[in-house]
Amino acid sequence: MSEIKIRENESLDNALRRFKRQCAKSGILSEVRKREHYEKPSVKRKKKAEAAKRNKSKF
């Protein structure tokens, strides 16, 4: 769980912005979205292979 401490004389907006940035860097939101619905292992493998194919074509 991401946790920040509000600094002295820091506005709530700035603290919220820091918290959101910290969550984005740690990948919490993307992990939650990934786990929102069950995905069969075969579907995971298929998506992984397609992503590898896309990445290979970029380079």
Curated annotation (Swiss-Prot):
GO terms for cellular component: ribonucleoprotein complex; ribosome. Keywords: Ribonucleoprotein, Ribosomal protein. GO terms for biological process: translation. Residues 36-59 are annotated as: Disordered. GO terms for molecular function: structural constituent of ribosome. Residues 43-59 have a biased composition (Basic residues). InterPro entries: Ribosomal_bS21, Ribosomal_bS21_CS, Ribosomal_bS21_sf. It comes from the Bacteria. It holds the Pfam family Ribosomal_S21. Belongs to the bacterial ribosomal protein bS21 family. This is Small ribosomal subunit protein bS21. It comes from Alkaliphilus oremlandii (strain OhILAs) (Clostridium oremlandii (strain OhILAs)). The lineage of its organism: Bacteria, Bacillati, Bacillota, Clostridia, Peptostreptococcales.
